[in-house]
Design a protein with these regions (language model features):
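Conserved catalytic scaffold of divalent metal-dependent phosphoesterases
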Residues: 27, 37-47
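Active-site beta-loop-alpha substructure in enzyme catalytic cores
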Residues: 43-63
Length: 162
């Protein structure tokens, strides 16, 4: 769905510079047979209203699609930083979901945004979840894999159990 007033149509939302989407899938655990939903998003990097309303729309759509009883996960580039004005947009997620970074007993504090080394490193990428348990959260520094920057963001991962 598109992060806009018309999520079912190709569109640009609110004050966004770019068109943005959230993709989702319903998966079934091969071992236990239970289903869960995974959403991935990329909020706008310029529009404050687009970030705020995009986060609210994501929560609204997750509630509608996944419901209250099924485990649900969302990750992505939220273009928001805790402790900054943009961090306020993340409250839309934490009102209904838990932060994987905060909930995992093992968690690092490495920033996810590297800007290819040309700008200040900071955390802009997050994982939120509901009806699961986070075990380990990590930002994968690509230097350990022999390539300094594969993107302007490092991957973030979290191990969960249901």
């Amino acid at each position: 769905y598109w992060l806009s007033e018309t999520p079912g149509e190709v569109s640009r939302g609110w004050d966004a510079k770019n068109r943005r989407i959230t993709v989702w899938v319903c998966l079934r655990d091969k071992v236990f047979g239970g289903k869960f939903y995974y959403f991935n998003t990329h909020l706008d990097h310029k529009g404050h209203e687009a970030r705020r309303r995009g986060a609210l729309l994501n929560v609204e759509m997750m509630r509608k699609i996944a419901g209250k009883r099924t485990p649900v996960f969302i990750s992505g580039d939220m273009n928001a930083e805790i402790g900054q004005k943009t961090g306020e947009y993340l409250k839309a997620y934490t009102a209904w979901l838990e932060s994987a970074h905060d909930a995992a007993p093992e968690s690092d504090d490495r920033p996810s945004f590297n800007g290819f080394g040309k700008s200040r490193a900071r955390t802009l990428d997050y994982i939120y979840f509901r009806r699961a348990r986070a075990l380990r959260y990590e930002t994968l520094d690509s230097e350990a894999y022999g390539v300094r920057y594969v993107s302007d963001h490092y991957p973030i991962v979290c191990t969960f159990v249901f």
